[in-house]
């Protein structure tokens, strides 16, 4: 796995492009803080997107049922695996680290059609 630091000047473009490639992914958000320890904010929820708002100086991680805001982000690191981005780590102005882990949503098998041929007779 390779890790890359993303320069702040590229955050908006990087997250816009990343969000387009994350359709169908699920995310887990962990907040690591010296004061509070490690807390899981969200567990494998459908990911809508990640965006950087330069005007308000925040990163928004939008999940199906949660909007997670990171105020005053200072550093962004991305972990790349074989299939692309597997995690994003963001350090905020208070020294907390927010880790977004990504995975593909589970694919369910197609419904069985065993009984459908009998009902059409």
Regions inferred by a protein language model and the residue ranges of each:
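A short, Trp-centered hydrophobic/proline-enriched beta-strand micro-motif
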Residues: 23-32
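Short coil-to-beta-strand transition motifs
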Residues: 36-46
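Acidic, aromatic-enriched beta-alpha/helix-loop junctions
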Residues: 44-92
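A structural micro-motif recognizing beta-strand termini
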Residues: 32-34, 64
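Helix-rich interaction surfaces within compact, conserved domain-sized segments
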Residues: 72-121
